[in-house]
């Protein structure tokens, strides 16, 4: 199974539609890539009733509510971590997590009671986690990151290729 962990609901995305990355800029690259690698039946998601079906994957966020100024506070991240911890506990052994950005990366580590020092964030990096879980890091697919070329479509697809290969082992 494949769990994608984002930052928080976007104002024009999940906060408005109820589905993570649906209807916002970050979702454009995410859903296109999910489709390309066989994790969804549609190439895009603009609204909840669009018949999107995710295949062997789920999308969640480190923070569950819309943060002020689109950046969650340390307290919001901490308060929501118990929900992420619960979601991770439900994963079967051998599942793969994708951390979209440093905040999601750190939230996953906190949920698993792991230290950030031992698991440094780096785009495309693979981390072995307890319970035979694996985490991959990626820069967040935000408008800012894609427009500044911090994250390109090719870079994002390379991480998904690693994940797809991991899941096919």
Region annotations inferred by a language model:
Residues 1-121, 125, 129-169:
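A polyanion-binding, active-site-adjacent surface
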